[in-house]
């Protein structure tokens, strides 16, 4: 709980004023805010093996501290032996306290555990949101390496209220995300 309070406090005391002066906002309501973090795992192999969904839900719940939900297919695709409403993925949407806890864990613990880590790409979506692809779930400390049956990757999307990529980059950089080729201010 103290981590959450520290990140929120850091945003209010240091990050928000820095962004306000950097972009010359006239109102505090214009300052970009991290709205939510969405973690998604696409599990195409779940068509053949139903147990993968249960394992992925348990792992995602352990990583995020919030119950994961199975995503289902919307239509039949015969070539992939896929039927409508079959579970084919797992996702979690984090907001408020859990969002800040997960962000803290991601930046301070998980990302430094990636092999040959040199920073994350700086590709945004044009509206200030950022998606990070992770190859292995074993970088999180909650996952016991001996008990996993399959290495699974995931997408982590940071949804911000930023209007431009530059504002979103500045916000996430202030939160401590280690971008490659970070611009020196």
Curated annotation (Swiss-Prot):
<keyword id="KW-0689">Ribosomal protein</keyword>
<dbReference type="InterPro" id="IPR022803">
    <property type="entry name" value="Ribosomal_uL5_dom_sf"/>
</dbReference>
<dbReference type="Pfam" id="PF00673">
    <property type="entry name" value="Ribosomal_L5_C"/>
</dbReference>
<comment type="similarity">
    <text>Belongs to the universal ribosomal protein uL5 family.</text>
</comment>
<comment type="function">
    <text>This is one of the proteins that bind and probably mediate the attachment of the 5S RNA into the large ribosomal subunit, where it forms part of the central protuberance. In the 70S ribosome it contacts protein S13 of the 30S subunit (bridge B1b), connecting the 2 subunits; this bridge is implicated in subunit movement. Contacts the P site tRNA; the 5S rRNA and some of its associated proteins might help stabilize positioning of ribosome-bound tRNAs.</text>
</comment>
<dbReference type="Pfam" id="PF00281">
    <property type="entry name" value="Ribosomal_L5"/>
</dbReference>
<dbReference type="InterPro" id="IPR031310">
    <property type="entry name" value="Ribosomal_uL5_N"/>
</dbReference>
<dbReference type="GO" id="GO:0006412">
    <property type="term" value="P:translation"/>
</dbReference>
<dbReference type="GO" id="GO:1990904">
    <property type="term" value="C:ribonucleoprotein complex"/>
</dbReference>
<keyword id="KW-0699">rRNA-binding</keyword>
<dbReference type="GO" id="GO:0005840">
    <property type="term" value="C:ribosome"/>
</dbReference>
<protein>
    <recommendedName>
        <fullName>Large ribosomal subunit protein uL5</fullName>
    </recommendedName>
</protein>
<keyword id="KW-0820">tRNA-binding</keyword>
<comment type="subunit">
    <text>Part of the 50S ribosomal subunit; part of the 5S rRNA/L5/L18/L25 subcomplex. Contacts the 5S rRNA and the P site tRNA. Forms a bridge to the 30S subunit in the 70S ribosome.</text>
</comment>
<dbReference type="GO" id="GO:0003735">
    <property type="term" value="F:structural constituent of ribosome"/>
</dbReference>
<dbReference type="GO" id="GO:0019843">
    <property type="term" value="F:rRNA binding"/>
</dbReference>
<dbReference type="InterPro" id="IPR020930">
    <property type="entry name" value="Ribosomal_uL5_bac-type"/>
</dbReference>
<keyword id="KW-0694">RNA-binding</keyword>
<dbReference type="GO" id="GO:0000049">
    <property type="term" value="F:tRNA binding"/>
</dbReference>
<dbReference type="InterPro" id="IPR031309">
    <property type="entry name" value="Ribosomal_uL5_C"/>
</dbReference>
<keyword id="KW-0687">Ribonucleoprotein</keyword>
<dbReference type="InterPro" id="IPR002132">
    <property type="entry name" value="Ribosomal_uL5"/>
</dbReference>
